[in-house]
């Protein structure tokens, strides 16, 4: 993602740490079940109280401690003194004709993040954000228009799932979030510990119980973290944002490739496959006359040949971003020709189905557009006050 930033000068000042903000309390969603039990015991309660609280949070999905009717007022006071439940505020909801829902949430420090709900044939899938902004350096992506401001806490990541589920709970239609993809704004493995805690929380059988095989984490290619992740024992799916079949091209569109070129990346991927015996999915965004030539498809087939039985390639239509107008979407004919080369080489691949094309579809676009409007409004208000003096 590029170095372009749309922040105004006042926003560039050093930000106050979240935990130093007056009145800040972390979300209780940030605790694992074992940590919640330990905390309850340390505060004079029996272990079963923590189990009751966990059930209120993840099975009954309450939004305040006061709704926990079998918890004493004294213990509720302790909870309120130390935690909040959901730290996010809903700013904008956009619903597409195809059922895709895009949410803009405000964090306790006023920063904005996006979350997307996609209706699939197999259920409801939520795409969560893990960082405010991104420093990875993909030149085609809306997420990196704002540099990374901070990591999200584990509680803030879990809270996205909980608010999306609340959206459907309030509608009363009984629909449940069944799948999660960690593919929103930010690089998940650059916020490794919080993402791992999030995964273990939503996968917990006593809580949301989202199956590991229904969870996918996407990385742009932090090779050392891929190896580390292989040893964590979490059986979730791994996706790698590849987007180019050779180092020269990949380095030109993804800055991370300069640190972890394809040789290092594929060494880590092979280690992951050998360690977990799990398939890896490669994401390949189709950029018109950039990475969509038939020879690029042949290079991609050759690159993945060694791990063909345990790999899969998603060809992704590009969602244009106004700030990156030097890129455009590959034509259907070019995508079809690229796909045909892969299939002739025996590659498992698919052209990804698009979602939410009639709303701010590209990752980071809703947030970026909202920030622009907020700044324009602030400038207009400041100008009006100045003229009124």
From Swiss-Prot:
One Pfam family from the record:
Radical_SAM
Q: Which UniProt keywords apply?
A: 4Fe-4S, Cytoplasm, Disulfide bond, Iron, Iron-sulfur, Metal-binding, Methyltransferase, rRNA processing, S-adenosyl-L-methionine, Transferase, tRNA processing
Q: Where does [4Fe-4S] cluster bind?
A: 134, 138, 141
Annotated InterPro entries: Aldolase_TIM, Methyltransferase_A, RlmN_N, RNA_MTrfase_RlmN, rRNA_lsu_MTrfase_RlmN/Cfr, rSAM
| Binding locations of S-adenosyl-L-methionine | 186-187, 218, 241-243, 319
For the region Disordered, what residue ranges are annotated?
370-389
Q: Which GO terms describe its biological process?
A: rRNA base methylation; tRNA methylation
Disulfide bond sites: 127-363
Give residue ranges for domain Radical SAM core. 120-358
Where does this protein reside within or beyond the cell?
Cytoplasm
Which cofactors, if any, are listed as required? [4Fe-4S] cluster
Basic and acidic residues compositional bias: what residue ranges?
371-389
A GO CC term attached to the entry: cytoplasm
As for what it does, the entry says:
Specifically methylates position 2 of adenine 2503 in 23S rRNA and position 2 of adenine 37 in tRNAs.
Give the similarity note.
Belongs to the radical SAM superfamily. RlmN family.
Q: What is this protein called?
A: Probable dual-specificity RNA methyltransferase RlmN
């Amino acid at each position: 993602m590029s170095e372009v930033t749309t922040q105004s000068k006042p926003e560039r000042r050093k930000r106050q740490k979240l935990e130093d903000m007056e009145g800040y309390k972390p979300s209780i969603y940030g605790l694992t079940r074992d940590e919640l039990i330990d905390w309850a015991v340390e505060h004079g309660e029996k272990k079963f109280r923590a189990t009751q609280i966990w059930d209120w949070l993840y099975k009954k999905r309450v939004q305040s401690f006061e709704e926990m009717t079998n918890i004493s007022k004294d213990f509720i006071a302790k909870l309120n003194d130390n935690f909040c439940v959901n730290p996010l505020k809903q700013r904008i909801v956009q619903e597409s004709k195809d059922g895709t829902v895009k949410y803009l949430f405000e964090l306790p420090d006023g920063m904005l993040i996006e979350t997307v709900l996609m209706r699939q044939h197999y259920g409801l899938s939520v795409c969560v954000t893990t960082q405010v902004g991104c420093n990875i350096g993909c030149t085609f992506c809306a997420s990196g228009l704002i540099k990374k401001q901070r990591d999200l806490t584990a509680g803030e990541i879990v809270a996205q799932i909980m608010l999306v589920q609340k959206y459907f709970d309030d509608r009363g239609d009984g629909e449940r979030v069944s799948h999660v993809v960690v593919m929103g704004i930010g690089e998940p493995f650059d916020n490794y510990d919080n993402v791992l805690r999030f995964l273990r929380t939503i996968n917990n059988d006593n809580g949301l119980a989202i199956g590991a095989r229904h969870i996918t984490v996407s990385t742009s290619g932090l090779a050392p973290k891929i190896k580390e992740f292989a040893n964590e024992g979490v059986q979730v799916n791994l996706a790698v944002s590849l987007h180019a079949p050779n180092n020269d091209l990949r380095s030109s569109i993804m800055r991370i490739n300069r640190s972890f070129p394809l040789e290092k990346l594929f060494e880590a991927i092979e280690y992951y496959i050998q360690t977990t015996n799990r398939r890896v999915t490669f994401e390949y965004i189709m950029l018109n006359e950039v990475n969509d030539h038939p020879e690029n498809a042949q290079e991609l087939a050759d690159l993945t040949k060694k791990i063909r039985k345990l790999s899969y390639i998603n060809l992704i239509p590009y969602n244009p971003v106004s700030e990156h107008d030097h890129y455009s979407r590959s034509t259907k004919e070019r995508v079809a020709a690229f796909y045909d080369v892969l299939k002739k080489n025996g590659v498992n691949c698919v052209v990804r189905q698009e979602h939410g094309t009639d709303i701010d579809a590209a990752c980071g676009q809703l947030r970026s557009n909202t920030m622009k409007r907020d700044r324009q409004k602030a400038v207009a208000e400041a100008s009006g006050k100045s003229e009124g003096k």
